[in-house]
Amino acid sequence: MELLQRTRKINKLLQEHKGIAVDFKEMADYLGSAMQSNVFILSRRGKLLGFGVNELLKNERIIKMLEERQFPETYVELLLNINETKSNIQIENDLSVFPSENADLFAQSNTVIIPIKGGGTRLGTLVLGRVDRAFDDEDLVLGEYAATVVGMEILREKHADIENLARDKAAINMAINSLSYSEKEAIEHIFDELGASEGLLVASKVADRVGITRSVIVNALRKLESAGVIESRSLGMKGTFIKIKKENFLEELSASH
């Protein structure tokens, strides 16, 4: 397959998603097929975002690593020291993606390390591995192009996460500001009582202990639930199950004093 055709297929992956995040597993599978290699797309900290492997499934340590979706910390540290593409790394090198304990099986293997960058920062690493053939210049061009595409997607996801956090913060603050003094006090006592982000609440017990009416607790919970901050479910005589939906709620509640 010519380089132009292979590059166009990566473009097609982007175009078909129409604003939805590109599936890194799909990207890795395509690269593995187009380049006839094992492919690993890693975050900066070594989390496995996507992979396409074949020969490496012969090794138990690799299988466990894929199941945990995390590369070893020592290997990730080595990757972060690589600031530009490093190609055709041999099995004897610590940067080889092939397991050294099976050096006899992978004696002719080659590894390529391609840093994934975006916005002036290191976002991750693209790792390629072949069992018995070196990578040529066309392979490296395609790999570097794929790394650029992955970097753009990681940045897009980061920006989306920031926007979601900002929306959640605004919703939380609006909900907190809608509470009366006694309702806010009731909510603080409720989560002190639970000692966690979810649990079973017996409103009458909290009301008696704190010295407020049960209706204050009920009203406070309704306001938070209508704002999408918590969810609650009545369990009859057992009480009410409460769960925080927006993870920064307790932090914002504490900061609102």
From Swiss-Prot:
One GO CC term, this protein: cytoplasm
One Pfam family named in its UniProt record: HTH_CodY
DNA-binding region(s) in UniProt = 203-222
Give compartment(s).
Cytoplasm
Q: Which GO terms describe its biological process?
A: negative regulation of DNA-templated transcription
Electron transport in keyword set: no
Q: Domain of life, per the record?
A: Bacteria
Q: Where is this region: GAF domain?
A: 1-155
Q: Which SUPFAM superfamilies match?
A: Winged helix' DNA-binding domain
Keyword Magnesium found: no
Q: Per UniProt, which keywords does this protein have?
A: Cytoplasm, DNA-binding, Repressor, Transcription, Transcription regulation
Which Gene Ontology molecular function entries are recorded, alphabetically?
DNA binding; DNA-binding transcription factor activity; GTP binding
| Main subcellular localisation | cytoplasm
What family name appears in the similarity comment?
A: Belongs to the CodY family.
Role of this protein: DNA-binding global transcriptional regulator which is involved in the adaptive response to starvation and acts by directly or indirectly controlling the expression of numerous genes in response to nutrient availability. During rapid exponential growth, CodY is highly active and represses genes whose products allow adaptation to nutrient depletion.
- Classification via HAMAP family: HTH_type_CodY (MF_00621)
State what protein this is by name.
Global transcriptional regulator CodY
From the UniProt record, report the name of the gene that encodes this protein: codY
